[in-house]
A protein has these predicted regions:
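N-terminal, non-cleaved signal-anchor transmembrane helix
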Residues: 1-25, 32, 200-246
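Membrane-embedded alpha-helices of multi-pass transport/permease systems
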Residues: 37-41, 48, 52-55, 69, ...
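Hydrophobic alpha-helical transmembrane segments of polytopic membrane proteins
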Residues: 165-201
Length: 246
């Protein structure tokens, strides 16, 4: 928590907050799409070997083609703006998640699969209730890769309308302003560290929540519940008392 606070404090103190929030907004859209797409693609590759053989060269191509090469077709299809930048980011960040998912599911212990068959789990239950939870630690490596690659794409995506910190770095490079470019670059690093720590903390909390599933949701997530209660309370106070609206 202190490290995450220090990262965001660094961004605020150096005046990069607005650009960082623009970058964070695009990353928070691209990362879930990349994770979900990679997870589903990896599960399909694990289930169907023929699909995996056909998918392998596609993933190789997505990972080896320079990012600049597919900016032009993305611009033609989606135009100049944040949408094109998010699409380019997803294309760049999805392949590692797909590969890690397929590999992680194969590495689940045979005893775990046998246990799922013994209790009569269907194919869907075997995948989502047995294999995926058992491979959570390995899958988190894929999640980390998606986050890091999404932030790695920030500067390149700024060329097609992403804005945010990537645009600040690009503008500083055009002006040869080393100081401004270094500040924006370090802000990207701080954002990456904060998101990585938050994702790891979320995974650990979910693992502990599985062991304490019998308790209520507010008891399992007291800080989130308190935050939501505070937001609702301040919103209601703003409706009742005009002084709270400002």
């Amino acid at each position: 928590a202190l490290l995450v606070f220090a990262c965001f404090a660094f961004i605020l103190v150096f005046g990069q907050w607005q650009s960082a929030m623009a970058t964070l907004a695009s990353v928070l859209v691209a990362v879930p799409i990349g994770i979900a797409g990679g997870l589903l693609t990896g599960i399909a590759a694990y289930r169907h070997p023929r699909f995996e053989r056909a998918l392998a060269p596609v993933l190789d191509m997505m990972q080896t083609i320079p990012a600049f090469a597919y900016l032009v077709p993305i611009l033609f299809l989606f135009g100049f703006g944040p949408t094109a930048a998010i699409v380019a980011t997803v294309v760049y960040a999805l392949p590692p998640m797909a590969r890690i998912t397929a590999l992680s599911l194969r590495q689940v212990a045979p005893e775990v699969r046998d246990l799922g068959r013994m209790v009569g789990a269907t194919r869907r239950q075997m995948t989502w209730r047995v294999l995926v939870p058992s491979a959570r630690d390995s899958l988190m490596v894929g999640v980390n890769q998606v986050i890091m690659l999404s932030l790695n794409m920030v500067i390149i995506a700024s060329m097609i309308g992403a804005g945010g910190l990537g645009f600040d770095v690009l503008a500083a490079l055009r002006r040869l302003d080393i100081g401004a470019g270094l500040e924006a670059g370090l802000a990207i690093v701080a954002l990456a560290v904060a998101l990585d720590r938050l994702s790891q903390a979320f995974a650990q909390r979910e693992a502990s929540a599985l062991a304490d599933r019998g308790s209520s949701w507010p008891a399992r997530h007291p800080h989130v519940a308190a935050g939501l209660a505070l937001v609702v309370a301040t919103y209601l106070l703003g409706l009742l008392l005009p002084a709270f609206r400002t």
